[in-house]
Design a protein with these regions (language model features):
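Proline-centered loop/turn at the N-terminus of a beta-strand
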Residues: 72-74
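Short glycine-rich anion-binding loops that position phosphate/pyrophosphate groups of nucleotides
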Residues: 11, 57-60, 83, 169-171
Length: 287
């Protein structure tokens, strides 16, 4: 018997209703369903799950992807609300795609994920993230100083609101808001981006996917670590963490007719193009 787990946005009634309808449909097909905790943790009974379905937006999807990574199964995003980069299908098309997963004919796309581990002075379980790992300032009115090493080589010490290490999937999320580059998901890399750095150099680094990034909290202010916005961990001054590609990539269920990544970028950010009435501005030099 197939078993499908659900992670739902509890604050959206349409998401709750959609999840209940999908669960009823699955049960009528003879499948078992389980509602996973909203934080993306695993079923209390430890039973295996064949698919995790998120019903909501990209934030809900990230929690579902976290659970799916531990369960070793794919994750499918049913979009409710605003368009995102991760949710894949409208509620009306969800049953067809779920059926394809359970019979083994669905298209599965592997996405690089991240893991962060404690080093000297830090104490927390290793964390997994699909989008990003972030170390930010603890006090709102203070900056945090973070020394950056890549593969053992010292790079710089950022005095900033924080530092993000993102995957290509996460390059359109918080890293983008911090002026990081957009990287297509098939180009595996680590993207290191400072947040509002108070120094002349405030640009991102795009690193080899096999790189290991270490961040050390310097100065007098502690930092706060999180992965994909989940529960934060305080990092005292002098503590270090290591961030690298995870050995457990995310497995995303995709539609065969899904739009390409750059088409999503154009739609999401409203980029101008041939369909626009206005002529593009001249950007060449005068004369």
């Amino acid at each position: 018997m197939s078993r499908v787990g659900f992670v739902t946005h509890p604050g959206r009634s349409v998401a709750v209703e959609t999840a209940e309808e999908l669960q009823a449909w699955l049960q009528a097909q003879g499948a078992d369903t389980v509602v996973l905790p909203g934080d993306g943790s695993l079923p209390a009974d430890g039973t295996a799950v064949d698919l995790v379905v998120s019903v909501g937006g990209d934030g809900t999807f990230l929690r579902a992807a976290y659970a799916a990574s531990d369960l070793g199964c794919p994750v499918l995003g049913v979009k409710v609300g605003r368009m995102g980069f991760l949710t894949e299908v409208e509620p009306s098309g969800a049953t067809e795609l779920i059926s394809a997963v359970l019979v083994g004919t669905a298209r599965i796309e592997r996405r690089m994920a991240l893991t962060v581990e404690p080093l000297e002075g830090a104490d927390f379980p290793a964390q997994w993230g699909l989008n990003e790992v972030m170390v930010e300032k603890h006090a709102r009115h203070r900056l945090v100083r973070l020394a950056v090493e890549v593969d053992g080589d010292y790079v710089t010490t950022f005095s900033a609101d924080g530092v993000i290490v993102a995957s290509p999937t996460g390059s359109t999320a918080y890293s983008f808001s911090a002026r990081g580059p957009i990287v297509t998901p098939n180009v595996e890399s680590l993207i290191l981006t400072p947040i509002a750095a108070h120094m002349v150099f405030d640009r991102s680094f795009v690193l080899d996917p096999g790189s290991e990034v270490s961040l050390e909290v310097m100065g007098e202010e502690s930092g706060v670590l999180s992965a994909d916005g989940r529960e934060s961990v305080e990092l005292p001054v002098g503590s270090r963490v290591r961030i690298r590609a995870s050995s457990r990539p995310a497995a995303l269920v995709r539609r065969d007719d899904a739009p390409g990544f750059l088409s999503l970028v154009r739609e999401k950010f409203g980029l101008p193009g041939d369909d626009d009435d206005d002529e593009p501005d001249d950007v060449g030099s005068p004369g």
